[in-house]
Each structure stands twice: as C-alpha cells, then as structure tokens.
Amino acid sequence: PLIAQFSDEDLVVGGGVAIFHIASQRVVICSAPDRRGEKYYFLPKGRRDAGEDSRTGAEREGYEESGYRNRLLPLPTKHRQPQAHPRVDSPPLTAEPVWMQMMPLGYGSKQYVLYWYIAETLPPGLEVELETEVGAAYKPPPAYPHSLTLRDRVKMEPEGYEPLHHEGTGVDEEEATYESHLVSVEEAIKKLGRTGVMADVVLKGWKEIQHRFAME
C-alpha cells in the first residue's frame, strides 16, 4: 500500500475486462503488432469516458477493443467494500474489481489507475436486442440477472454456439489494428505471460467462476 495524491488534471481512471465464454471454457484476448512488428497479446482495457460509470466503461472498452459484447459477471470474490445501508446481510456475489493497477501515463506526472473486472459474453437473445449499425453509439447491456445461475445461463445457448464477434468496433486507428481471439484459459495465460497482471486476472476470474459453480 502507498500514499499518494494527484490533482484532477493528472489523474486518469480506466477499466479492463477478462471476457469469458463460460460454456466452452474460453476467454477473449486481443493482439496487435508492436514497434518491431511482432505480435503481442493483451486483455481489452481503456479509459472510462467523462461521467461514465467505471463498470460500464470497462464493458464498453471490452466491446470496442475486442468486438465482443459483454457484461460483468457477479462472482463470490472477496472484497473490502461496505454493503449499502441498511446492511441486512452481505450478498454472496458481487461484480467488484478483482485487480487494480497503477501506472504512470506518458513521461509526465500523470497517474493511470486501472480496475480489472470479470465479464461474460452475451446470450444470443441479448445480442439481437443490442444490435446496432457499425459506428453507432455504444448500447450497454442490462446487468446479469441476480436469480440466473451459471448452469441456466449456459442452457440459454444452443450446443456448439459461438459468441457473436462484431467487426469495426474500434474507435481509432490503433484499435482498428487489434485482432481478437477466443482461446482456452491455459492458452490465454501462456500468451499473456504467466507472471503478468493480465494472466493473473484471467486466473482469478476462472477460479471464481468455478467457485460460483460449486456454490450453486
């Protein structure tokens, strides 16, 4: 833990997501060429828009950079956030961040604070409801229903269903070069780097998904 202060003009807040297709036990990762032309892999992330909720911003960035619509997934993760008043009991499932990064931004004194969330691809019915034209404003999905179990969620997809991938969702020239891949958890960890934060996010997310299955 550290103590630091940043004025509004030096602080940037963002969010990222590990997007899981639970039925096939796969996760979305992105790739792009580095300065030497070699491919590197990453999870979708980015700055939230002014006035935007951090969770919505993470879902939106996940969609824009990967092309997969997604929604945050409530999981039995441990956290230290207080419950809303009146505090009758603690809900066993929350969609709180599973990781936080602090990184310098550029070469100045600006600080980037990034929150990592766990999300899922959307069921076919929601994809139809949220369908928009290329270049249209982002349409956020409804939250994951509190009463929907993971097993019932999986049953909402026909056997062998492939999550819908949208083309042209990047909002700038750099994002237009991104490619997305739906890969196994093991492959994602290998490509993201076993000691990197993004690999940790995937590991944490998959562990908590299995924990929720066990609870149900």
List the predicted regions and their residue ranges.
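Nudix hydrolase/Nudix homology domain
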Residues: 36-40, 110, 114-116, 120-216
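Acidic, metal-coordinating catalytic segment for phosphate/diphosphate chemistry
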Residues: 1-16, 20
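Short, P/G- and charge-enriched loop/turn segments at secondary-structure junctions
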Residues: 1-7, 94-107, 166-169
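Active-site beta-strand termini and strand-to-loop segments that position acidic
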Residues: 19-23, 32, 119-121
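Acidic pyrophosphate-coordinating catalytic loop
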Residues: 79-113, 124-125
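Conserved beta-strand and immediately adjacent loop positions that scaffold enzyme active sites
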Residues: 16, 26, 179
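Conserved Nudix-box catalytic region and its N-terminal flanking loop in Nudix hydrolases
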Residues: 23-87
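A conserved hydrophobic position in a structured secondary element of the catalytic/binding core
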Residues: 20, 43, 183
